[in-house]
């Protein structure tokens, strides 16, 4: 049973404050074993700086409600006209209510259908070809159409130990989220259909 009945809500009008990210968890019987959405990263690779990148930044901030950070080129590629250190992409990381809010809208853009190959241990990635497919977004001829990638990371309570500054430690193998659990989370909690290979 999905955590939210999508037939009763309008994804074009929903706001992050209307959602509670704690409801979007997969209960596995023990409070420390429950699985939840850790983060949703939205990435746009533009491949060039300048006006097109600024337009993409405007589109991304409208989509996510956050100011994107600029991603820089790691090396110079003369054929593409890219210099090292030049901004060529955008990234926004969303957490908690904003993450669930954006993920529901992004999944609606792909009809709540994902390929089995998109899943690995605790992570899911998928792309959207045109940002206007996302409910609530609008087409602006002055900006154009951009595609983007969505990367979702799932976690369990206690995962913070691998990111904290003091007394950092690895998460045990048995406590990590497996690929099967990731697929089950998306099917049971978000109501996603999985396309087999």
PLM regions and their residue ranges:
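Ribosome-associated RNA-binding proteins
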Residues: 2-197
